[in-house]
């Protein structure tokens, strides 16, 4: 019967977009949530930059996070610059681009801060500086911060956001994993508090070292928390991973983190932990 005959249809991939009309749409007008896929006007994002539907936290620069997290802050070790021990091709250009994007000299902001009135040593990794990668001087800044906190008997709060060890620095980058963890162990041995907040993404050598050492470990909603990348794992085991396998919610179920906290609640939560963690005077 003609009623049931196949009809000719035009597939979506054969429909040509009106390039002229596309050019009339201002750049940055719309945002798309990488977690739930919601498309919305960029003006709906406030200072926290979270998806209005699923609370996924869009990536922030260290200074953007610092602006709403702390009422006071003082940057330490800001003059430390990345090294280029291997003279890696185009590395200097990547460093220059990272500095321009973030206003930092390295992939982590370090300093003294007050969060909800509680004084703490603070480190915030910046995913816009060579993907927040852990380089030789990133590790140096973190180590110096933790050692200073131990000497001054301060707690330490670290926000992680990293693609892992910085490949352009080879073994010098990998050595920072042990170096920072050793500083953390000395800090803990002194009876001081070490808090970690995992943000999107926390992967590779950072996950395998100081991101996993928190006395209390928090994570932002839907943050990617992993060691190896999805494609690497799937090509190794020849199986597809579940969609949420490397998300904070799955990691929480398996006991790796203690709590998922919404970005709007981070300041209050950290202030409470710092106050009642036994490391602060009233």
UniProtKB/Swiss-Prot annotation:
Gene3D superfamilies: 2-enoyl-CoA Hydratase, Chain A, domain 1 (3.90.226.10). Zn(2+) binds at residues 33, 36, 51, 54. Binds 1 zinc ion per subunit. It catalyses: N(6)-carboxybiotinyl-L-lysyl-[protein] + acetyl-CoA = N(6)-biotinyl-L-lysyl-[protein] + malonyl-CoA. Its EC number is 2.1.3.15. Pathway: Lipid metabolism; malonyl-CoA biosynthesis; malonyl-CoA from acetyl-CoA: step 1/1. Disulfide bonds: none annotated. Keywords: ATP-binding, Cytoplasm, Fatty acid biosynthesis, Fatty acid metabolism, Lipid biosynthesis, Lipid metabolism, Metal-binding, Nucleotide-binding, Transferase, Zinc, Zinc-finger. It is found in: Cytoplasm. PANTHER family: ACETYL-COENZYME A CARBOXYLASE CARBOXYL TRANSFERASE SUBUNIT BETA, CHLOROPLASTIC. Belongs to the AccD/PCCB family. Component of the acetyl coenzyme A carboxylase (ACC) complex. Biotin carboxylase (BC) catalyzes the carboxylation of biotin on its carrier protein (BCCP) and then the CO(2) group is transferred by the transcarboxylase to acetyl-CoA to form malonyl-CoA. This is Acetyl-coenzyme A carboxylase carboxyl transferase subunit beta. The lineage of its organism: Bacteria, Bacillati, Bacillota, Bacilli, Lactobacillales.
């Amino acid at each position: 019967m003609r009623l049931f005959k196949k009809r000719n249809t035009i597939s979506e991939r054969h429909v040509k977009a009106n390039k002229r009309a596309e050019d009339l749409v201002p750049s940055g007008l719309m945002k798309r949530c990488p977690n739930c896929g919601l498309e919305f006007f960029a003006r709906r994002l406030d200072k926290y930059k979270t998806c209005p539907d699923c609370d996924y936290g869009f990536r922030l620069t260290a200074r953007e996070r610092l602006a709403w997290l702390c009422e006071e802050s003082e940057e330490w070790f800001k003059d430390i610059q990345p090294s280029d021990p291997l003279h890696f091709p185009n590395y200097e250009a990547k460093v220059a681009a990272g500095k321009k994007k973030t206003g930092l000299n390295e992939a982590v902001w370090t300093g003294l801060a007050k969060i909800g009135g509680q004084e703490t040593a603070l480190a915030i990794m910046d995913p816009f500086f060579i993907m927040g990668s852990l380089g030789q001087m990133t590790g140096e800044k973190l180590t110096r911060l933790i050692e200073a906190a131990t000497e001054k008997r301060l707690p330490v709060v670290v926000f992680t956001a990293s693609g892992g060890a910085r490949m352009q620095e080879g073994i010098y980058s990998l050595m920072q994993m042990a170096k920072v963890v050793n500083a953390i162990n000395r800090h803990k041995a002194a009876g001081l508090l070490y808090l970690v907040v995992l943000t999107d993404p926390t992967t590779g050598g950072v996950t395998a070292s100081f991101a996993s050492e928190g006395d209390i470990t928090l994570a932002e909603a839907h943050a990617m928390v992993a060691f190896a990348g999805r494609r690497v794992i799937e090509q190794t085991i020849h199986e597809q991973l579940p969609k949420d396998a490397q998300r904070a919610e799955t990691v929480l179920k398996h006991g790796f983190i203690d709590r998922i906290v919404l970005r709007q609640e981070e300041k209050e939560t950290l202030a409470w932990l710092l106050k009642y963690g036994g490391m602060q005077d009233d």
